[in-house]
């Protein structure tokens, strides 16, 4: 609804700007502390017109004509700004739209195909806490883009050819594989033992090098052992992702781009640019004119390709199949992501959009798969579920165990997802489960509780025969400040989706979710719903609670959080 409001404001301002004798193609709209929207257009026009921004704003305001039935109530000049307020048509139209569209409210306004890659951790062990941020940011972005209307395909790019996989493959022939363990954890066990063995006996490293050469040449037996190792690890990783409510559509493997000839082809395309040179026997790409002093190695001295080379082929493939390609990478990929983008630009291919995130840690310290000192995502999720159960048990001791377990899982996973996604990607963060699970703080559990509260109000209204979802609503009665604030916040749903889809900053949607829950709780605090003095007013307010329930449910789903009906 807010996008429709913006469109109407833009049209009204365009006409007024033209009538005032100015020209502009962007009304420079933004949020305002004094109104529903504000325009800074007068600042830009003032320099051209050689007038003060205040005078320009007043001239435009004097030409404002608001069509009948518009969502816009008024436009006024305040100094150099043009402030815009939404009217009753907007307020009442929003409520009616939510009741009519339900789960579809606020979505499906964009089009285009997007390939989004996230997580893509090496399959040499389980996901750890550091990987979780990648998964949650990527999955949330995918949900935002899908709800906005894009055709989104989510990829987990599987490194099935790298040195680490060669070590795992080699290790499976040397060490016992614990089939009683979760497969990704069992893979980590043999990988850690293999690294210790290779450190103790450096001469065995040549066996790893040989495996890498054989797999790139297409040796069937070597490929089979690599596939076995990778598939075991990925099967365990999928289980962990499912626990977090994260799912991928495709798991493309690096090796497929070797087998298809895409890697050889892209090497030739890069050579054709005249940017390649031989450096100590390796083929490198000179990207100095893109600001990179360090060359990019795309082929080793023994003729084998690198992860980067195969990644270039993968991105070329993606670019041919989508309007936008998006990658979620950790901060340690800043350099390589820039080189990747520059190389694709140099050969005239579609460039990816990157979401680079800083790392998440725990108060306990850092994580490393190579040394065996890490805290797995499984360990964290099990711990958070246990702690969530204790919180639910304290609050609802009278409820059966299965209820507590179900709510604990929903709330626990929601706490992890929300606490991580609420932080801007470029900021590092420390995950503290006590803070994440604090029902008094405005985190995931607070938003979920707001939804459960709405469900409880509606259930009580139905049980007491006070309301039916089929009842018509008199929107003209919803005039209290807290009612109007809640309706305006719900109307912002599509605008927040649009903003996040364009800027790829999911934390802003998490902030919106918290503000929406707060607006609902403020409404319930300041107005009487079930005990409203007038029957028609009571029915309208209950219907508004139902609208809030639907938008809260949509918001939680977009964030990948469960929407419990009772907590």
From Swiss-Prot:
EC number per UniProt: 6.1.1.19
Subcellular location: Cytoplasm
An example Gene Ontology molecular-function term: ATP binding
Matching SMART domains: Arg_tRNA_synt_N, DALR_1
Keywords in alphabetical order: Aminoacyl-tRNA synthetase, ATP-binding, Cytoplasm, Ligase, Nucleotide-binding, Protein biosynthesis
InterPro entries: aa-tRNA-synth_I_CS, Arg-tRNA-ligase, Arg-tRNA-synth_N, Arg-tRNA-synth_N_sf, ArgRS_core, DALR_anticod-bd, Rossmann-like_a/b/a_fold, tRNAsynth_Ia_anticodon-bd
One Pfam family hit: DALR_1
Motif 'HIGH' region, residue range(s) on this chain: 121-131
Catalytic activity, as annotated: tRNA(Arg) + L-arginine + ATP = L-arginyl-tRNA(Arg) + AMP + diphosphate
Protein name per its UniProtKB record: Arginine--tRNA ligase
Gene this chain is encoded by: argS
């Amino acid at each position: 609804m807010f996008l429709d409001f913006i469109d109407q404001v833009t049209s009204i301002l365009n006409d007024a700007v033209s009538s005032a004798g100015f020209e502009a193609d962007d009304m420079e709209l933004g949020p305002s502390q004094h109104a529903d929207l504000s325009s800074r257009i007068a600042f830009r026009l003032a320099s051209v017109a050689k007038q003060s921004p205040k005078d320009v704003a007043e001239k435009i305001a004097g030409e404002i004509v608001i069509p009948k039935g518009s969502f816009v109530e008024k436009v006024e000049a305040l100094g150099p700004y043009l402030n815009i307020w939404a009217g009753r048509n907007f307020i009442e139209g929003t409520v009616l739209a939510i009741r009519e569209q339900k789960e579809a409210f606020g979505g499906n306004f964009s089009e285009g195909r997007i390939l989004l890659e996230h997580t893509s951790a090496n399959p040499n062990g389980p996901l750890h806490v550091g990987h979780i941020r990648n998964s949650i940011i990527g999955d949330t972005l995918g949900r935002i883009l899908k709800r906005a209307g894009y055709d989104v395909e989510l990829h987990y790019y599987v490194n099935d050819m790298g040195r680490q996989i060669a070590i795992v493959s080699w290790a499976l022939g040397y060490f016992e594989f614990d089939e009683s363990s979760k497969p990704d954890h069992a893979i980590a066990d043999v990988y850690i033992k293999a690294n210790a063995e290779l450190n103790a006996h450096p001469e065995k490293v040549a066996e790893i090098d040989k495996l890498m050469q054989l797999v790139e040449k297409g040796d069937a037996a070597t490929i089979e052992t690599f596939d076995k190792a990778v598939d075991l690890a990925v099967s365990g990783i999928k289980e962990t992702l499912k626990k977090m409510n994260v799912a991928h559509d495709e798991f493309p493997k690096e090796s497929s781009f070797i087998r298809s000839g895409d890697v050889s082809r892209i090497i030739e395309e890069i050579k054709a640019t005249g940017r390649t040179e031989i450096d100590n026997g390796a083929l490198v790409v000179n990207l100095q004119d893109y600001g990179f002093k360090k060359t990019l190695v795309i082929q080793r001295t023994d003729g084998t390709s690198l992860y980067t080379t195969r990644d270039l082929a993968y991105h070329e493939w993606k670019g041919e199949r989508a309007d936008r390609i998006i990658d979620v990478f950790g901060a340690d990929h800043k350099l390589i992501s820039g080189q990747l983008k520059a190389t694709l630009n140099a050969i005239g291919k579609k460039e990816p959009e990157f979401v680079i995130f800083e790392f998440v840690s725990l108060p306990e310290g850092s994580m490393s798969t190579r040394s065996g000192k890490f805290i797995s995502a499984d360990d964290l999720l099990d711990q958070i579920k246990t702690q969530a159960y204790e919180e639910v048990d304290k609050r609802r001791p009278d409820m059966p165990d299965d209820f507590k377990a179900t709510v604990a899982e929903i709330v626990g996973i929601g706490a992890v997802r929300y606490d991580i996604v609420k932080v801007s990607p470029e900021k590092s963060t420390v995950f503290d489960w006590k803070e994440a699970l604090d029902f008094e703080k405005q985190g995931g559990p607070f938003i979920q509780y707001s939804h459960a509260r709405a469900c409880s109000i509606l259930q009580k209204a139905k049980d007491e025969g006070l309301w039916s979802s089929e009842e018509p609503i008199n929107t003209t009665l919803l005039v209290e400040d807290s009612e109007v604030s809640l309706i305006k916040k719900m109307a912002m749903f599509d605008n927040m989706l649009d903003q996040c889809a364009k800027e790829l900053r999911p934390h802003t949607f998490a902030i919106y979710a918290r503000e929406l829950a707060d607006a609902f709780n403020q409404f319930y605090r300041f107005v009487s719903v079930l005990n409203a003095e007038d029957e028609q007013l009571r029915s309208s307010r209950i219907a508004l609670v139902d609208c809030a329930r639907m938008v809260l449910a949509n918001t939680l789903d977009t964030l990948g959080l469960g929407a419990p009906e009772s907590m």
